[in-house]
Amino acid sequence: MESKNRAKLLVSVLAIVIAFAVFIKPLVSTVKQGLDLQGGTHVVLQAQETPESKVDDDAINRSIQIISRRVNELGLTEPVIQRQGKDKIIVELPGVKDPEQAIAMLGKTAMLEFKDMEGNTVLTGKDLKDSKASADQSGQPVVTLQFNEDGAKKFADLTARNVGRQIAILLDGKVLTAPRVSEPITGGNAQITGSKDAKEAEHLAILLRSGSLPVKLEVVENRTVGPTLGQDAKDASMKAFAIGLAGVFLFMLLYYRLSGLVADIVLLLYTLLLLAVMKGLNATLTLPGMAGIILSIGMAVDANVLIFERFKEEIANGKTLRAAVNSGFSRAFTTILDSNVTTLMAAAVLFYLGTGPIKGFAVTLALGVLISMFTAVTVTKFILGALIGSNFTKNPAWFGAKAFQPKAKDGKGEAAR
């Protein structure tokens, strides 16, 4: 039995330590990071009601879809686009190199119109099938338009009726170009000239491809975090995390000895599982989120403290180490459960009512609490039970506890004669 427990102890401890050493660095580097850690742009867009467009759920949802297409076309990785309230849209663009140009693209309505000399709108962006940036024969940047079947017929009719005359191509009411028609164009294609460079042509093509916004959007908040500032915040947070974790490890080891060592090893597993779950859920790690992780580590340690104190009380009452472990965990479980349920309720409220960073804090806190329930109770009990069952020592002092002292019959604390 002792050899079996020793094998359990050795395998479990080695598995945790090796897994931590192998996976901690890849997990830390691949967990999705928020703007405050890696830099980027945070924009809040507010829908503006006009006589032509009404702000409702459908308009906001369609706007989110169009903005998502524009952001994806820009090639930005892991953007965050979500609704806030009834008329606002939050857009977070991590690692964006040209925030001003990106912001300009996000809120641009991009209403394309083809008008004749009388001012009649003949075609709109709805008649487009595709748009691409390219260069003409002289090397100048242009945007090539491809119309859908209905649009091709309209464009052929427009050019046939206006040979020798100009037609205007407008974007959001501003004339982009006004070419003179030399002959009817029946191929279903057109070109927009006037872009100052290839980048501007590409952005115009993206706007036209993604479609026009159903409502006007105005930038009401714009915050940019530089990559250097984000890296500094990340480094400071990691340093604080490492110092705090080392302090907890040292305290548990000095005060609870072998029990504390078990708790420290389990904390390694806790940290690993938390990062793995965050990566699996594609959760974003922010500065408030790191605060939530540190707080949840404190709660995991608090659970161990409750268990170990009950464990010490049971030993002081004369129970064997194994009986004290079982009884200590049973007595502490209700208190731990109550505390964690209360924290989960608070995290749920923060997530429901909060936005952005507050939600990040709530998510990491809730995940940490749930994982700590598993590690602090189940894993700690398993390893501690294997340690005691291996008969490494029967001295309670090795577990930070005092040995049972029988009371004297006269109640004065002296041994009966």
Swiss-Prot record:
Its main location: membrane. It is a multi-pass membrane protein. Keywords: Cell membrane, Membrane, Protein transport, Translocation, Transmembrane, Transmembrane helix, Transport. The chain crosses the membrane at residues 9-29, 236-256, 258-278, 288-308, 333-353, 360-380. The keyword Membrane applies. It comes from the Bacteria. It holds the Pfam family SecDF_P1_head. SUPFAM superfamilies: Multidrug efflux transporter AcrB transmembrane domain. One of its GO terms (molecular function) is protein-transporting ATPase activity. One of its GO terms (biological process) is intracellular protein transmembrane transport. It is found in: Cell membrane. The keyword Transmembrane applies. One of its GO terms (cellular component) is plasma membrane. Belongs to the SecD/SecF family. SecD subfamily. Forms a complex with SecF. Part of the essential Sec protein translocation apparatus which comprises SecA, SecYEG and auxiliary proteins SecDF. Other proteins may also be involved. Part of the Sec protein translocase complex. Interacts with the SecYEG preprotein conducting channel. SecDF uses the proton motive force (PMF) to complete protein translocation after the ATP-dependent function of SecA. This is Protein translocase subunit SecD. It comes from Acidaminococcus fermentans (strain ATCC 25085 / DSM 20731 / CCUG 9996 / CIP 106432 / VR4).
